[in-house]
């Protein structure tokens, strides 16, 4: 009978820690490209919908990723994307 191989790789950090690390990186990048009031509004909207939950963190990451990609693709003079 087939068996899954043993996991001998390095230990991964917990998913929640990884989410918080990713959110922090994306927030730092977003602050460089978007006005703070807009980012605060998005954060407040996500908090209103999802509360203080991991689903809210995931949704905020998705929104900021899409906003940054669109910004890079269509208008950021510092980006090589779309050049």
Curated annotation (Swiss-Prot):
GO cellular component: host cell; host cell nucleus; virion component
Repeat is among the record's keywords: no
Subcellular location: Virion; Host nucleus
Domain of life: Viruses
GO biological-process terms attached to the record: symbiont entry into host cell; viral penetration into host nucleus
Keywords assigned: Activator, AIDS, Cell cycle, Host nucleus, Host-virus interaction, Phosphoprotein, Transcription, Transcription regulation, Viral penetration into host nucleus, Virion, Virus entry into host cell
Keyword rRNA-binding: no
Pfam families xrefs: VPR (PF00522)
Modified residues (Phosphoserine): 79
Oligomeric and partner information: Interacts with human UNG.
Physiological role: Stimulates gene expression driven by the HIV-2 LTR. Prevents infected cells from undergoing mitosis and proliferating, by inducing arrest or delay in the G2 phase of the cell cycle. Cell cycle arrest creates a favorable environment for maximizing viral expression and production.
Protein name: Protein Vpr
Organism classification: Viruses, Riboviria, Pararnavirae, Artverviricota, Revtraviricetes
């Amino acid at each position: 009978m087939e068996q899954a191989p043993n996991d001998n790789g390095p230990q991964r950090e917990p998913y929640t820690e990884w989410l918080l690390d990713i959110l922090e990186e994306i927030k730092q990048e977003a602050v460089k490209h978007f006005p703070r009031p807009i980012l605060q509004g998005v954060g407040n909207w996500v908090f209103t919908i999802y509360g203080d939950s991991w689903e809210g963190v995931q949704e905020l990451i998705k929104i900021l990723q899409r906003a940054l990609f669109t910004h890079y693709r269509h208008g950021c003079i510092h980006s090589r994307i779309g050049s």
